[in-house]
UniProtKB/Swiss-Prot annotation:
Database matches in InterPro entries: Ig_E-set (IPR014756), ML_dom (IPR003172), NPC2-like (IPR039670)
General remark: The sequence shown here is from clone 2. The N-terminal sequence (AA 1-8) from clone 1 and 11 are not yet known.
UniProt-recorded name of the protein: Mite group 2 allergen Der f 2
SUPFAM superfamilies: E set domains
PANTHER family from the UniProt entry: NIEMANN PICK TYPE C2 PROTEIN NPC2-RELATED (PTHR11306), NPC INTRACELLULAR CHOLESTEROL TRANSPORTER 2 (PTHR11306:SF68)
Organism annotation: Dermatophagoides farinae
Length: 146
């Protein structure tokens, strides 16, 4: 019975957070990006007023004591900084980072209820270290809905 529950839990976890297709906008440091409820190159639906979880596996390209998260969204061609995010990446992964080592960051934030609906959302996420960009990914298949 316990093994059946464990198998079901693993299956649900695999369905909820699947790897998504992203474009690397740095030097191929990003190894994998997973977003709750999003799969491959299918459009990723972001719901206003709901939490949104992003997890990324990347290789550090530098030694750094600190790391900052920068998230920008392009809504129908208009680029904005995503409001209300905690920009200290060290709150979501262990710092300092060592060049050449692989790290996992899991970040959750609430999408503002006032976010405009859009069927054409491009999200750019950058991790910035003491010496510049650590990793960068662009997701091009987003939609914002209720």
């Amino acid at each position: 019975m316990i093994s059946k529950i464990l198998c079901l839990s693993l299956l649900v976890a695999a369905v909820v957070a699947d790897q998504v297709d992203v474009k690397d906008c740095a030097n191929n440091e990003i190894k994998k990006v997973m977003v709750d409820g999003c799969h491959g190159s299918d459009p990723c639906i972001i719901h206003r007023g709901k939490p949104f979880t992003l997890e990324a596996l990347f290789d550090a390209n530098q030694n750094t004591k600190t790391a900052k998260i920068e998230i920008k969204a392009s809504l129908d061609g208009l680029e904005i900084d995503v409001p209300g995010i905690d920009t200290n990446a060290c709150h979501f992964m262990k710092c300092p980072l060592v060049k050449g080592q692989q790290y996992d960051i899991k970040y959750t934030w609430n999408v503002p209820k006032i976010a405009p609906k859009s069927e054409n959302v491009v999200v750019t996420v950058k991790l910035i270290g003491d010496n510049g960009v650590l990793a960068c990914a662009i997701a091009t298949h987003g939609k914002i809905r209720d």
